[in-house]
């Protein structure tokens, strides 16, 4: 019975060493999602406040509706404006 007892102790010893935590290597695919979430919320909050400040400052105007003035009005612009005036006076 002694050899069976030794084999049983040897098997239990192997199992404990196999299940013991080995030194873990750094896994490059393990991320800290809590700090990533907090950082994202901080950046989103800063961008939101910056957007509100830009809208309230009224410095950002629509550029597509403003034309560069060269000094002389375009001929087409003058005829277009006059045609609009003519149409608006007819409706009254």
Curated annotation (Swiss-Prot):
Keywords: Cell membrane, Glutathionylation, Ion transport, Lipoprotein, Membrane, Palmitate, Phosphoprotein, Potassium, Potassium transport, Signal, Sodium, Sodium transport, Sodium/potassium transport, Transmembrane, Transmembrane helix, Transport. GO terms for molecular function: sodium channel regulator activity. Present in heart, esophagus, stomach, aorta, skeletal muscle, smooth muscle, and liver but absent from brain and kidney. PROSITE patterns: FXYD. Changing residue 83 to A: Loss of phosphorylation. Decreased affinity of the sodium/potassium-transporting ATPase for Na(+). It is a single-pass type I membrane protein. Residues 83-92 have a biased composition (Basic residues). Pfam families: ATP1G1_PLM_MAT8. Residues 57-92 are cytoplasmic. One of its GO terms (cellular component) is intercalated disc. Residues 21-35 are extracellular. Residues 65-92 are annotated as: Disordered. A lipid is attached at residues 60, 62 (S-palmitoyl cysteine). Residues 1-20 form the signal peptide. It is found in: Cell membrane, Sarcolemma; Apical cell membrane; Membrane, Caveola; Cell membrane, Sarcolemma, T-tubule. The chain crosses the membrane at residues 36-56. GO terms for biological process: negative regulation of protein glutathionylation; positive regulation of sodium ion export across plasma membrane; potassium ion transport; regulation of P-type sodium:potassium-exchanging transporter activity; sodium ion transport. The modification Phosphoserine is found at residues 82-83, 88. Changing residue 89 to A: Loss of phosphorylation. Major plasma membrane substrate for cAMP-dependent protein kinase (PKA) and protein kinase C (PKC) in several different tissues. Phosphorylated in response to insulin and adrenergic stimulation. Phosphorylation at Ser-88 stimulates sodium/potassium-transporting ATPase activity while the unphosphorylated form inhibits sodium/potassium-transporting ATPase activity. Phosphorylation increases tetramerization, decreases binding to ATP1A1 and reduces inhibition of ATP1A1 activity. Phosphorylation at Ser-83 leads to greatly reduced interaction with ATP1A1, ATP1A2 and ATP1A3. The modification S-glutathionyl cysteine is found at residue 62. Associates with and regulates the activity of the sodium/potassium-transporting ATPase (NKA) which transports Na(+) out of the cell and K(+) into the cell. Inhibits NKA activity in its unphosphorylated state and stimulates activity when phosphorylated. Reduces glutathionylation of the NKA beta-1 subunit ATP1B1, thus reversing glutathionylation-mediated inhibition of ATP1B1. Contributes to female sexual development by maintaining the excitability of neurons which secrete gonadotropin-releasing hormone. Belongs to the FXYD family. Homotetramer. Monomer. Regulatory subunit of the sodium/potassium-transporting ATPase (NKA) which is composed of a catalytic alpha subunit, a non-catalytic beta subunit and an additional regulatory subunit. The monomeric form associates with NKA while the oligomeric form does not. Interacts with the catalytic alpha-1 subunit ATP1A1. Also interacts with the catalytic alpha-2 and alpha-3 subunits ATP1A2 and ATP1A3. Very little interaction with the alpha subunits ATP1A1, ATP1A2 or ATP1A3 when phosphorylated at Ser-83. Interacts with non-catalytic beta-1 subunit ATP1B1. The cytoplasmic domain is sufficient to regulate sodium/potassium-transporting ATPase activity. This is Phospholemman. The lineage of its organism: Eukaryota, Metazoa, Chordata, Craniata, Vertebrata. The gene is FXYD1.
């Amino acid at each position: 019975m002694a050899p069976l007892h030794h084999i049983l102790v040897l098997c239990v010893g192997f199992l404990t060493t196999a299940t013991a935590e080995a030194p873990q290597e750094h896994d490059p695919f393990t991320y800290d999602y809590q700090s990533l979430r907090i950082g994202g919320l901080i950046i989103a909050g800063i961008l939101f406040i910056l957007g509100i400040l830009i809208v309230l400052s009224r410095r950002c105007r629509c550029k597509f509706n403003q034309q560069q003035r060269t000094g002389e009005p375009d001929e087409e612009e003058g005829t277009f404006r006059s045609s609009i005036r003519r149409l608006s006076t007819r409706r009254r």
